Regions:
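Flexible interhelical linker loops that connect adjacent transmembrane helices
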Residues: 36, 113, 226-249, 284-293
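Hydrophobic mid-bilayer segments of alpha-helices in multi-pass membrane transport proteins
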Residues: 5-23, 46-66, 81-95, 146, ...
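Membrane-interfacial helix-loop connectors
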Residues: 135, 141, 145-175, 188-207, ...
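Juxtamembrane and boundary regions of transmembrane helices in multi-pass small-molecule transporters
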Residues: 3-30, 103, 163-166, 170, ...
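Interfacial loop-to-helix junctions that mark the boundaries of transmembrane helices
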Residues: 1-4, 40-48, 70-86, 201-211, ...
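Helix-loop-helix module between adjacent transmembrane segments
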Residues: 92-98, 118-119, 130-142, 174-183, ...
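Transmembrane helical segments that form the transport core of multi-pass membrane transport proteins
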Residues: 65-77, 101-105, 251-354
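Short "domain-exit" segments at the C-terminal end of structured domains
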Residues: 372-388
Length: 388
């Protein structure tokens, strides 16, 4: 019990740390640039490393509690499964490459041209309504990264107003979050629990998917109506794109499809990833810089959650089992304001014999809300708002 209480305490400290990152960044400016104190405080101010950092503290605390480093190693190696963090790392890097991004842009542009509106308006609708649903197939982190790159090029780099910028960011986060629920293998909150709860494709589509798709379209139309005048006033970007051979785009799509297909087999999809890195190196004239840093940070973030999750069942089980569907639904609403939705569903999956009603309430509410503490969202926000 001591180890479980310790794990919960460290998990709570990690959550509190996420709220203090801005303060650490401010303190860092009080020290000379390049000094130990300045670098340490900047390190502590990185949101994406918070849960991984505290997970490393948990590792050594676990070893100290058992008076053996081997017990801690055994816990990491044999009691935890890091397949999902590894998968998210790989799929984010593969999906954010120039051939895949340009293919997605052409697909979205084809949908946009079906709408009898100016392209700056129709592309906005197609990206945030139709594009958000891509997260159900190429995964939520990949779709988030890909759509952010398209929106940055066509809107954020063209001096849109702050209200439109923040409305677009919020709409992107929510739509991609709920748009990943058409399938059982794409969104991290679903991916973390689908196999344990035996939720397949048809279950997700019939219970969550159609509702999510409808919500994406309605919310996008509302935001578009509010900012229609500003979207109409924007100038079209330069339509020219650097040539990419069809065969190379096909190979990239094949690699992405293979990674998704083998998502439950880390040794296999990492092998595909190694081949992909070789392909990118050999065809560097058609490539942009890989988003390795972003993928690694998100993977590290999710891995930290995995380390903590297994030791939280002792307090979650009695808490959740004493709730009905409505109580859990609104409780999850409050929790997603301060923690990651993948963490919430992962923690909930540790409770045995959870009813179908409670499972639905937990996933529905955690997918419906996003918080500023979610690492993929935080990175995308930084990408969109940085200067060109």
């Amino acid at each position: 019990m001591f180890v479980k209480v310790l794990a919960t305490t460290l998990f709570a400290l990690a959550v509190l740390h996420t709220f203090a990152v801005k303060k650490f960044a401010q303190w860092a400016h009080h020290y000379p640039q390049g000094s130990l104190q300045e670098n340490l405080l900047h390190f502590l101010a990185e949101t994406e490393i918070v849960f991984g950092l505290w997970a490393s503290v948990m590792f050594f605390a676990y070893a100290a509690a058992h008076r053996s480093i081997h017990h801690a190693v055994e816990y990491i190696e044999n009691q935890l499964d890091f397949t999902e963090p590894k998968f998210v790392l790989v799929v984010m890097v593969v999906a954010a490459t120039r051939p895949v991004v340009q293919l997605a842009e052409r697909m979205i542009l084809s949908v946009a041209r079906l709408l009898p509106l100016k392209e700056t308006v129709s592309f906005f609708i197609a990206t945030l309504a139709f594009g958000s649903l891509l997260g159900s197939f190429i995964t939520e982190p990949a779709a988030m990264t890909l759509l952010a790159m398209l929106l940055k090029d066509r809107y954020f780099d063209r001096g849109i107003s702050r209200p439109l910028a923040y409305a677009t960011i919020g709409l992107l986060f929510v739509n991609v979050s709920i748009g990943g629920t058409l399938t059982h293998f794409a969104a991290p909150p679903v991916l973390m629990v689908a196999s344990k709860w035996n939720w397949g494709f048809w279950h997700m589509l019939s219970n969550f998917g159609w509702r999510s798709a409808a919500a994406c379209f309605v919310s996008t139309l509302i935001v578009t109506a509010i900012f229609c005048r500003q979207l109409n006033s924007l100038q079209l970007p330069d339509a020219s794109r650097r040539f990419i051979p069809t065969w190379l785009t096909g190979l990239h799509v094949a690699c992405l499809a293979a990674v998704v297909y083998f998502s439950h087999y880390p040794d296999v999809f990492f092998g595909v990833f190694m081949l992909f890195l070789g392909l990118v190196t050999a065809t560097r004239e058609y490539q942009d810089s890989l988003k390795l840093k972003e993928g690694l940070l998100v993977g590290f973030f999710l891995a930290g959650l995995v380390v903590f999750s297994k030791l939280q069942a002792w307090w979650l089980e009695p808490l959740i089992q004493n709730m009905n569907g409505s109580m859990l639904y609104y409780g999850a609403t409050a929790l997603t304001a301060i923690t990651d939705n993948a963490a919430l569903t992962l923690l909930g999956s540790q409770v045995p014999n959870l009813s179908d009603e409670l499972k639905f309430a937990l996933l529905a509410r955690s997918e419906e809300h996003t918080s500023e503490l979610q690492s993929p969202d935080h990175l995308v926000c930084r990408l969109l708002l940085e200067k060109k």
